[in-house]
Amino acid sequence: MTVSTTSLCTPIVKICGLTVEAAHCAISSGADLIGMILVPDLKRTVQQTKLKAISRAVTRIPGVPTSPSRGIDRPSHGLVRGTFSADYTSWPLVVGVFRNQSLDEVLRMLRNYDLDIVQLHGSEPLHQWTREIPVPVIKKFGLGEDDLMAPGLHAVTLLDGGAGGEGQKISWEGLPGSGAFMLAGGLTVDNVAVAVKIPNVAGVDVSSGVATDGMQDLEKNCRCLFRNAKGW
């Protein structure tokens, strides 16, 4: 694996939050995508009572610019310019994370919680679903899976270890040599600065890597993660 010494563009940074407070911290720190895990019965699944509040918090934090015209540092990677920027004029965006749920459930939650992006972590039939889901789709893959970089099936490829969201690190040595993608799996405050310099990594997706005993450490890990990922 070759790691460049400088970053040519601002990477996308996505973080999953459990609470409104976590979303506030992530946004003020520079998050581009705020994820809500909507898979039932996982440790990091967002409680139903908090979903709407987190979604609303993304665009209603006083003093935090949500429009590029008001100075927010939008991610500059070409993957974002070609995928998200034409559709959205404000940042950050809300991402709903699903795994092997029905299409009806995905569409219902998309409408109910004003999701900007759908992220699929299971064995969903992309050929059918991407025609039905009216927002960009981030699709999780493991290394070597079929359709990993197939054009037209999904907006963004996410490479992750295991089922995803479990902190299982993916082998960086086997990452694709072409085509932009987002990287997840075992990313932490300590290694994210290296991860964003790997060729073709357009962004990072972090969840358990900013947790302390299962709870997000808002003042330390979260803010430090964004400083390291963005190079601020």
Curated annotation (Swiss-Prot):
SUPFAM superfamilies: Ribulose-phoshate binding barrel. PANTHER family: N-(5'-PHOSPHORIBOSYL)ANTHRANILATE ISOMERASE. Gene3D superfamilies: Aldolase class I. One of its GO terms (biological process) is L-tryptophan biosynthetic process. One of its GO terms (molecular function) is phosphoribosylanthranilate isomerase activity. Belongs to the TrpF family. This is N-(5'-phosphoribosyl)anthranilate isomerase. Pathway: Amino-acid biosynthesis; L-tryptophan biosynthesis; L-tryptophan from chorismate: step 3/5. The gene is TRP1.
